[in-house]
Amino acid sequence: MLNFDLLTTEGHARRGRLTLNHGVVETPIFMPVGTYGTVKGVMPRDLETMGAQIILGNTFHLWMRPGQDVMAQFGGLHRFENWTRPILTDSGGFQVWSLGEMRKISEEGVRFASPVNGDKLFLTPEVSMQIQTVLNSDIVMQFDECTPYWQGAKNVGHITTEKEARVSMELSLRWAARSKAEFARLGNPNALFGIVQGGMFESLREESLNALVELDFPGYAVGGVSVGEPKDEMLRIMNHTPHLLPADKPRYLMGVGTPEDLVDGVACGVDMFDCVMPTRNARNGHLFTRYGDLKIRNARHKADERPLDETCSCQACKGSTLPDGRVTGGFSRAYLHHLDRCGEMLGPMLASIHNLHYYLNLMREVREALDAGRFEAFRAQFKADRARGV
């Protein structure tokens, strides 16, 4: 089940409300990524506290471990990971693409060796739909081939040609039809999204988009971006494609990106975003703040008593209030620098909490700006603040 209400617009930017089987999602929204059924380093209750409304699961990796049988035993991913709100699962197409020469693509699907134990596996649109039905995710993604920006090995390959992108895009369209047919055969009560492909070629993007609209999916994603292309190429496709999708359906930009990418994506008509950047960067000492990015490993933070971001209300920056009124948490840059230098587990946990809170709070501010009819003013101030530097 999916219902999308478009509440207000400003230019291409949209404020909406997405109703799914496990709850309501206010858009635009950022979706934290839980590859193996967990958002790394963060408890589910903390995700809810910081405003996460929907999270991602990774079909490919959950198929590898723990497998369909365990997922079926638990009745799906929600009970398995103790998350009661909506979940989106990707189809496995991107992960198969990332295997490189370890996989062989045909009309039927993709053959590859399991990266876990070397078993020979065959992933098809039908199998992807079957796995995602067992996972019982609120939003299911069609099985697609992620069109790469670069063909072949680094330094000896070539940028994907229009002919190569067309072959890949047309295969994804045939797989979209097969995904939809299998999804219907299984009686899956959730929502299936189609994925626009076409590489860096706008004409192919439009061809893919129009064909998917003919198939009439409940929602649509723009895939094949942030796959190694230069930033200006990604921005060109981001400016071209999302606003051409049906206005009455949710629009999802896959795997993007930086805080600036999210705000610019909203301006291009995107409703939904996901990216591993908040947690991956956190584990490497890279923190996002209102006034730019902060590298906590730098020696200049060794004795700095300030929080990461004095405007942030997350547990790492401000702490939380206990029932007896005492405040717990709220840590200095010096302490977080110390944890990072010593390799202490608490360091990346607090950094992940901060980065996710920053992303989720940014999208809350975007929604409030759209509600107030001042999104472009917010966007300008956001960029000025980020450029100021910490």
Curated annotation (Swiss-Prot):
How is the cofactor bound, as the UniProt entry phrases it? Binds 1 zinc ion per subunit.
Question: Which Pfam families did the record assign?
Answer: TGT
User: Which InterPro entries does this entry report, sorted A to Z?
Assistant: ArchSynthase1/Queuine_TRR, TGT, TGT-like_sf, tRNA_ribo_trans-like
Keywords linked to the UniProt accession:
Glycosyltransferase, Metal-binding, Queuosine biosynthesis, Transferase, tRNA processing, Zinc
Q: Which reaction does it catalyse?
A: 7-aminomethyl-7-carbaguanine + guanosine(34) in tRNA = 7-aminomethyl-7-carbaguanosine(34) in tRNA + guanine
Where is the catalytic site? D90 (proton acceptor), D274 (nucleophile)
Membrane-crossing segments per the record: none
Identify the stretch(es) annotated as RNA binding: 255-261, 279-283
Binding-site residues, substrate: D90, S91, G92, G93, F94, D144, Q197, G224
Q: Which residues bind Zn(2+)?
A: C312, C314, C317, H354
**Entry keyword Transferase:** yes
The EC number(s) given in the record are 2.4.2.29
Instruction: Please verify whether the record's keywords include Transport.
Output: no
User: Looking at its record, which EC class is this enzyme?
Assistant: transferase
Q: What's a Gene Ontology MF term here?
A: metal ion binding
Q: In which pathway does it act?
A: tRNA modification; tRNA-queuosine biosynthesis
Q: Which GO terms describe its cellular component?
A: cytosol
For this chain's UniProt record, which GO biological process terms are given? Answer: queuosine biosynthetic process; tRNA wobble guanine modification; tRNA-guanine transglycosylation
Q: How does it assemble?
A: Homodimer. Within each dimer, one monomer is responsible for RNA recognition and catalysis, while the other monomer binds to the replacement base PreQ1.
Family statement: Belongs to the queuine tRNA-ribosyltransferase family.
Role summary: Catalyzes the base-exchange of a guanine (G) residue with the queuine precursor 7-aminomethyl-7-deazaguanine (PreQ1) at position 34 (anticodon wobble position) in tRNAs with GU(N) anticodons (tRNA-Asp, -Asn, -His and -Tyr). Catalysis occurs through a double-displacement mechanism. The nucleophile active site attacks the C1' of nucleotide 34 to detach the guanine base from the RNA, forming a covalent enzyme-RNA intermediate. The proton acceptor active site deprotonates the incoming PreQ1, allowing a nucleophilic attack on the C1' of the ribose to form the product.
Please name the HAMAP family in this protein's record: Q_tRNA_Tgt
UniProt protein name: Queuine tRNA-ribosyltransferase
